[in-house]
Amino acid sequence: MKRTYQPSNIKRKRTHGFRARMATRGGRLVLKRRRAKGRKRLTPTA
C-alpha cells in the first residue's frame, strides 16, 4: 500500500505557504493567530 505522505516542496508551498495563507481571509486569520501565539515560524519552511 502506498503511503499517504508523498513530500513535494512545490505542493507544500502552494497549499501552506505564506502567499497561500495571505490569499484568503481564513488564511490571514491563521497567520494572525500564530502571531498572537508568538510562533517563531508562521508557515512551514520549504
Swiss-Prot record:
UniProt keyword Ribonucleoprotein, yes or no: yes
MF (Gene Ontology): structural constituent of ribosome
A family per Pfam: Ribosomal_L34
Keywords attached to this entry: Ribonucleoprotein, Ribosomal protein
Disulfide topology: none
Superkingdom per UniProt: Bacteria
Keyword Ribosomal protein annotated: yes
One example of a Gene Ontology biological process annotation: translation
GO cellular component assignments: ribonucleoprotein complex; ribosome
Family assignment from sequence similarity: Belongs to the bacterial ribosomal protein bL34 family.
Protein name in the entry: Large ribosomal subunit protein bL34
